C-alpha cells in the first residue's frame, strides 16, 4: 500500500502551490470562528482559499450546518445526522459578507435530505438577507439537487441569485460510484428547470477529472450540459481528500486542461475555467451577467471612496 509520503511525491509539480497567508486571510478566518459560520473553502480544503479570501474578495459560505446527510466519495465535508436548523444563520452570513467587503459571495449548503423542504426556505432567506445588507455584492448559489424537489428549487430561484450553480461532478458512467445519492439525469433536470424558472440568471456546473473518465465521456457531458442550457462550466483536477475517498486515476496536465477549455468554448459555453486547481467557485466574480457586473463596479467605487476618506 502506498504511504502518505509516496502519494504526495506522485503529485505533479503543477499541483504544488505556495500558500500566501496574508493579514486579510487570517482576519477573515478568525471572524468565521467568532460567528460560528462555515465556509466550504475550509471544509472542502480548497487550494485557492488564500487567493479568493486575500485578493479577490470572494468567499463561499456553507449554510444549513456543517454536517451533510450524504456521503459522496469525493467530498471532504463531514457526514452524519445534522443538527437543527439555525434560524439566525441568514442574518449572520449577511453581516459577515458586509464585514468582509465581499465583491462576490457563493452560498452553498450541505444536503439536508432530513428536512421536508430540503432547507430551501432558510437558503432563500439567506440570499435575501445578504442582498438587503449588501446590494452591490453579487450572489451565487450552489445547492444540492434538493432530492429532486422542484418546489424547493422554485423557492431558491425566487430569491433571485446572480448565478445558479449545480455541479454534475463527473460523467454519466461514474456517477453511481462517485455520488450514489444523486443521479446524472436529475442534475441535468435541476439545471434545465433552473433556467426555465429564471431565464436571465446564468446557470453553471462543474466537472472533476481524474476519476477514470475518458475524453469522449467528458465531451458527452459537456454536450448534455449545453442541452440543459448551462452557460458556465468549470473543470478541475480531483484530489483525494483522504484514504477513505476515491483514488485519483489520472493527473491531467495544464495543456490537457487547455484543450478541454477550448472544446467547451467551441460547444457554446459563455465562460469556462479549466485547470488543475480550478474549483467550482474559482474566479466566480467574473462570471455574472452585465447587470450584475455593473453592481460590482458601483460597489468597488464606493469601497475605494470610503478608503480615501478614512
Swiss-Prot record:
Main localization (coarse): cytoplasm
Entries under Pfam families matching the protein: LIAS_N, Radical_SAM
Residue ranges annotated for the Radical SAM core domain, each copy included: 54-270
Catalytic reactions on record: [[Fe-S] cluster scaffold protein carrying a second [4Fe-4S](2+) cluster] + N(6)-octanoyl-L-lysyl-[protein] + 2 oxidized [2Fe-2S]-[ferredoxin] + 2 S-adenosyl-L-methionine + 4 H(+) = [[Fe-S] cluster scaffold protein] + N(6)-[(R)-dihydrolipoyl]-L-lysyl-[protein] + 4 Fe(3+) + 2 hydrogen sulfide + 2 5'-deoxyadenosine + 2 L-methionine + 2 reduced [2Fe-2S]-[ferredoxin]
Subcellular location per the Swiss-Prot or TrEMBL entry: Cytoplasm
Region (Disordered): 285-310
Involved pathway(s): Protein modification; protein lipoylation via endogenous pathway; protein N(6)-(lipoyl)lysine from octanoyl-[acyl-carrier-protein]
Organism per entry: Staphylococcus carnosus (strain TM300)
GO cellular component, as recorded: cytoplasm
Binding site for [4Fe-4S] cluster 2: 68, 72, 75
Domain of life assignment: Bacteria
Cofactor: [4Fe-4S] cluster
UniProt-listed SMART domains: Elp3
Comment on bound cofactor: Binds 2 [4Fe-4S] clusters per subunit. One cluster is coordinated with 3 cysteines and an exchangeable S-adenosyl-L-methionine.
Name this protein carries in UniProt: Lipoyl synthase
Molecular function GO labels: 4 iron, 4 sulfur cluster binding; lipoate synthase activity; metal ion binding
Gene that encodes the chain: lipA
Protein family membership: Belongs to the radical SAM superfamily. Lipoyl synthase family.
Binding site for [4Fe-4S] cluster 1: 41, 46, 52, 281
NCBIfam families the UniProt entry points to: lipA, PRK05481.1, PRK12928.1
Recorded coiled-coil stretches: none
Keywords associated with the record: 4Fe-4S, Cytoplasm, Iron, Iron-sulfur, Metal-binding, S-adenosyl-L-methionine, Transferase
EC number from the UniProt entry: 2.8.1.8
Amino acid at each position: 500500500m502506498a504511504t502518505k509520503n509516496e502519494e504526495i511525491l506522485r503529485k505533479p509539480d503543477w499541483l504544488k502551490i505556495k500558500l500566501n497567508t496574508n493579514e486579510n486571510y487570517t482576519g477573515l478566518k478568525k471572524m468565521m470562528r467568532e460567528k460560528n459560520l462555515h465556509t466550504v473553502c475550509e471544509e472542502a480544503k480548497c487550494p485557492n482559499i488564500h487567493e479568493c479570501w486575500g485578493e479577490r474578495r470572494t468567499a463561499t459560505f456553507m449554510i444549513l450546518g456543517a454536517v451533510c446527510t450524504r456521503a459522496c466519495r469525493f467530498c471532504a465535508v463531514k457526514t452524519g445526522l445534522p443538527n437543527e436548523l439555525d434560524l439566525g444563520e441568514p442574518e449572520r452570513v449577511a453581516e459577515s459578507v458586509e464585514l468582509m467587503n465581499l465583491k462576490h459571495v457563493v452560498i452553498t449548503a450541505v444536503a439536508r435530505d432530513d428536512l421536508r423542504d430540503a432547507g430551501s426556505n432558510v437558503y432563500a432567506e439567506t440570499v435575501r438577507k445578504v442582498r438587503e445588507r449588501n446590494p452591490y455584492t453579487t450572489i451565487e448559489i450552489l445547492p444540492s439537487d434538493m432530492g429532486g424537489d422542484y418546489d424547493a428549487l422554485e423557492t431558491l430561484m425566487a430569491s433571485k441569485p446572480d448565478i445558479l450553480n449545480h455541479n454534475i461532478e463527473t460523467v454519466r458512467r461514474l456517477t453511481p460510484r462517485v455520488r450514489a445519492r444523486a443521479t446524472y439525469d436529475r442534475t441535468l433536470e435541476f439545471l434545465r428547470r433552473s433556467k426555465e424558472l429564471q431565464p436571465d440568471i446564468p446557470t453553471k456546473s462543474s466537472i472533476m477529472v481524474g476519476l477514470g473518465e475518458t475524453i469522449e465521456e467528458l465531451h458527452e457531458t459537456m454536450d448534455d450540459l449545453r442541452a440543459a442550457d448551462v452557460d458556465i462550466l468549470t473543470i478541475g483536477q480531483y484530489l483525494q481528500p483522504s484514504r477513505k475517498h476515491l483514488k485519483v486515476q489520472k493527473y491531467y496536465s495544464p495543456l490537457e486542461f487547455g484543450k478541454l477549455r477550448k472544446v467547451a468554448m467551441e460547444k457554446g459555453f459563455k465562460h469556462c475555467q479549466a485547470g488543475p486547481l480550478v474549483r467550482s467557485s474559482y474566479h466566480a466574480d467574473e462570471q455574472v451577467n452585465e447587470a450584475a457586473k455593473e453592481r460590482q463596479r458601483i460597489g468597488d467605487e464606493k469601497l475605494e471612496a470610503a478608503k480615501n476618506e478614512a
